[in-house]
Amino acid sequence: LIKGSMEYHLIHKDTIDTVLDKARQYRSLREPDLAISICIDVFAVDADNQDALVIYILALTDQYSHQHAKVQPKKIAEMIAKLKSEFHQIYYTGIFLERKARALLKNPMSQSFAYEGLMEAIAKYEIAEKMAPKHCSDPILRYNSCLRTIEKENLQPRAEFDELY
């Protein structure tokens, strides 16, 4: 097949809910690329679909846990900005920062950067907690998870240059 000689097929708008269930399932199977592809298909027929946007953002950030994935931080930030709810923008920015920081934990030389990333995520979760809909504990759960990781990994802020000499 010659690149560009074929066109993508459009999904039917009335199948969006079922299709998004498949995207969620692929995320749970640790197949973010397939979830991303499905979300792109949804955007082709419903460009502003907020459920697809959330799944897309989460699938993009899922790539941080894949060793050879090409994570696109600018794309993630761009998609977060498309969320209509300020609460969701702040909350998913926290998730983005948290997942990026957790990926840094895999490299012992990056632990202080992981600390900073988790602290940035915690700050977002604190803001999101104040804005959260009634009976929504999601920002609290994420905040506590970040704090526990900092404690468990004994993460510290970077030493200042003067402290090194």
Q: What is the role of each PLM region?
A:
Residues 3-18, 80-83, 112:
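TPR-adjacent "capping" and linker segments in tetratricopeptide-repeat scaffold/adaptor proteins
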Residues 6, 127-165:
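Terminal, low-structured helical/coil segments at or just beyond the last alpha-helical repeat
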Residues 8, 42, 79-80, 128:
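Canonical positions in the second alpha-helix
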Residues 13-18, 46-62, 84-107, 137-149:
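Amphipathic alpha-helical repeat scaffolds of TPR domains
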Residues 15-38, 107:
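Alpha-helical segment of the N-proximal tetratricopeptide repeat
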Residues 62-85, 92-125, 152-164:
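Short coil/linker segments at helix-helix boundaries
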